[in-house]
Amino acid sequence: RPARIWLLWVPAIAVTVGVLVAAAIYSHGVAATRGWTLGQRLLSEPRVLFDYLCQLWLPRPLSPGLFNDGYVVSTDWMHPWTTLPAIAGLFGLGLVAWHWRNRQPALSLAIGFYLVGQSIESGPLPLELYFEHRNYLPAALMFWPLALWLTNPDTALPSVRAVTSIGLPLLLAGMTWLGASVWGNASGQAMIWGERNPNSPRAQAYLAQWELNQGRVRAAEARLRTALRSHPTEVQLVANLIDVRCRQGFLDKADLAAAVHSFSTNPDPTRLSFRWLQGALPMAEVHTCGGFGLPEAGQLAHAFADNPSTPVAPGRRSDAMHLLGEVALASGNAHEALADFNAAWASEQRIDTVLVQAAMLASAGLPRLALDHLQLASTPIVRPWYRWRSMTDVHRWVLHRQGFWQQQIDELRGKITSDLVHSP
């Protein structure tokens, strides 16, 4: 019995405590970045689990796909009304597994394994609410009781067992073929997922991108405007709308104002805002899109920086200041660009970002400012092992131990100094 305690209960308790500690750490500020609170997530997940179970026991040839950001959040016990029944049903499944553990061990194991397997990704960690792939491992034992019944010659209903043994694999094979035909067809994915997920901004943006690439510019514009009426703060929708309007040749002030509103109020300022704006800067510099030049790009960058959720989301404040620095540099405001780049470092000490920014300053003909900025990276900040929060911290520690960053800093400093010495 002592061995059982050490081999079973101690690891189980350690894992449980670890998950709860991680949940406490990562749930800080979750409402500002996810759009729901941790309590709302815990209320919603029982409904999600029953949706997963329906996919397993009532399979459909076509799934909602990858775009699940339109899933309705449970705001309390009764909204939606399925919240309380789902919670009660989840407790009921646990009681069934416990009650039948001696008489039906396979059934109890299948239920228990599924619930435990879902307890992390569908539990207190503030992940996205819904993803189909979370069903894979927890469902590994789901159909073991059915297989035992089908292969047991002593059970009743032999004709039903025979028909099920032949018909069920054929049915599942047919639905698998139908599903694979969609997953192997990008245009089919865009159309089907867009139609099946009308409340998903991701699905609508994905379908609009496909329509734009097919030359259906007006259809893409209409789709994005319809989606924006329900989701006015979604950056992916306004960013794609700007792309559509620029394809048409001009961005009017009303659409720019809608974009500024979205960038400044989006509760989940993901890296999408940074990547899209950074990709749009070359277009703004050469002014190939009427109504969208560097001043307009600067408005969006300032809106991103002024968003109240930006300082809360890890890394986004640094991204915002980097964008402002890029806009200032492209506009010829060298010292303003340096101040913004320095502010990005103050927000998050990332040596790779400093190297990129110093290279940008040097490429713009500002080697002295580049050397001044590079000096910030002379004392890299590396978290001690007991403060590691993610693999990113581990990776930074490894690179620091290997002297990688110092080598990169010395190499870039040498190139900039050489250019400065040989410049006229």
Which role does the model predict for each range below?
Residues 79, 191-424:
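C-terminal luminal/periplasmic domains and tails of membrane-associated envelope-modifying transferases
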Residues 1-245, 249-251, 260-269, 291:
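Polytopic membrane enzymes that build or remodel cell-surface glycoconjugates and lipids
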